[in-house]
Amino acid sequence: MRLMGLDVGSKTVGISVSDPLGWTAQAVEIIPIDEENEIFGIDRVAELVKKEQVAGFVIGLPKNMNNTEGPRVEASQHYGKLLQQRFPDIPIDFQDERLTTVEAHRMLVEEADISRAKQKKVIDEVAATFILQSYLDRHGRLVNKLK
């Protein structure tokens, strides 16, 4: 069993999964979505849930630096509700994702020397991995589901 990390954007959802023991997070893919037309890629998430044997979802919560919640927090919470409707037996938790995209950009530029064009293609995957790894490192409540 694994946990799935999700970085919900307005056009894509970055997906990561944990190893079966809950020690590390790995990037999986980016799912295109269209919020305006209510296309959320839930069918693709369902395929990945089955393939990866997902036991819990960890959704990034993009709070503002002053800890207030803006429209992107609402979008992440809405995505959580969609997952809850589709997968009522799989628990959901949220992880503060402040600065994960900034950290992902820094890592891609400084450490991996990735071009800007390629960054746009992988940034959400990397951010989803950072979100899930942070959750695993702090031993969020769903980590016990893996044991």
Swiss-Prot record:
GO BP field = rRNA 5'-end processing
Q: Name one Pfam family in it.
A: RuvX
Q: What is its EC number?
A: 3.1.-.-
Intracellular or extracellular location(s)? Cytoplasm
Q: Which domain of life is it from?
A: Bacteria
Q: Which InterPro entries match?
A: RNaseH-like_sf, YqgF, YqgF/RNaseH-like_dom, YqgF/RNaseH-like_dom_sf
Molecular function in Gene Ontology: nuclease activity
User: What cellular component GO annotations does this protein have?
Assistant: cytosol
Keywords in alphabetical order, please.
Cytoplasm, Hydrolase, Nuclease, Ribosome biogenesis
Provide the coiled-coil residue spans.
none
SUPFAM superfamilies per the record?
Ribonuclease H-like
Looking up HAMAP family in the UniProt record yields:
Nuclease_YqgF
Family, according to the entry, reads as follows: Belongs to the YqgF nuclease family.
Question: What role is this protein assigned?
Answer: Could be a nuclease involved in processing of the 5'-end of pre-16S rRNA.
NCBIfam families xref list:
RNAse_H_YqgF
What is this protein identified as?
Putative pre-16S rRNA nuclease
